[in-house]
């Protein structure tokens, strides 16, 4: 019984780690994608990045 619980907990931890790494990779891709759409405009300050993301969101909704 103890081995089964240990196995289930280890599987759960592995699944959580894999999901975390997938989210990190998705965030890296998103930054690169924004840099390709708005070259030179989104990298200067935080407000510009926010405006570029909002503009991109408006384009996808339209």
Swiss-Prot record:
Main location: secreted
Gene: SCRA
Protein name: Defensin-like protein A
GO biological process, one term: rejection of self pollen
Intrachain disulfide bonds: 42-52
Keyword Secreted in annotation: yes
Signal peptide: 1-26
Role of this protein: Truncated and inactivated form of SCRA, a protein involved in male-mediated self-incompatibility when active. Most A.thaliana cultivars contain such an inactive form and thus, are self-fertiles.
Domain of life: Eukaryota
Organism: Arabidopsis thaliana
């Amino acid at each position: 019984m103890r081995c089964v619980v240990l196995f289930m907990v280890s599987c759960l931890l592995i699944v959580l780690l894999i999901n975390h790494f997938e989210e990190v990779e998705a965030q890296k891709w998103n930054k690169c994608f924004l840099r390709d759409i708005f070259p030179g405009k989104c990298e200067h300050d935080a407000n510009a990045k926010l405006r570029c993301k909002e503009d991109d969101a408006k384009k996808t909704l339209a």
